[in-house]
A protein has these predicted regions:
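C-terminal regulatory
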Residues: 1-103, 129-131
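A late-sequence structural motif
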Residues: 95-131
Length: 131
């Protein structure tokens, strides 16, 4: 399963700073909230961050990154399904950022057929397919 990521901004951020017109505008004129390990995972995102003038907040927590984006501190990169669940966030799909990340489950081979573990794995699989 591939988890899809996109850029999001809050309505309060967009009313104050406007929408970025393109990636260059994002880098030069907009505030970015950043999860520190994302650049090591996606070269496309690293290139954007390296060229950004205003990285205003950095965190190692997905929950904190989402909170900062919702609070209007800056634009953030989030799983699309998570960002779309937040009523105040707008997906900036017009920028054309298409980043995905593999999502997988690991279990010990001796336990994967136990009913409780199999039920949990099946449940996680069903939930992630809805993301």
């Amino acid at each position: 399963y591939e988890l899809q990521f996109g850029l999001f901004a809050s309505m309060s951020y967009l009313s104050k700073f406007g929408y970025p017109n393109n990636i260059k505008d994002l880098q030069e004129n907009h505030r970015i909230c950043y999860r520190e390990n994302y650049a090591g995972v996606w070269p496309q995102w690293k290139k954007i961050i390296d060229g950004a003038r205003h990285v205003v907040a950095t965190t190692n927590s997905s929950a904190m990154l989402l909170r900062m984006t919702c609070d209007g501190i800056g634009i953030g990169l989030h799983p699309i399904a998570i960002g779309k669940r937040e009523r105040d966030l707008i997906h900036l799909s017009q920028l054309g950022i298409k980043i995905s990340h593999p999502f997988w489950i690991v279990s010990h081979k001796d336990g994967q057929d136990e009913p409780k573990i199999k039920a949990l794995i099946d449940h996680i699989r069903e939930v992630t397919l809805q993301l």
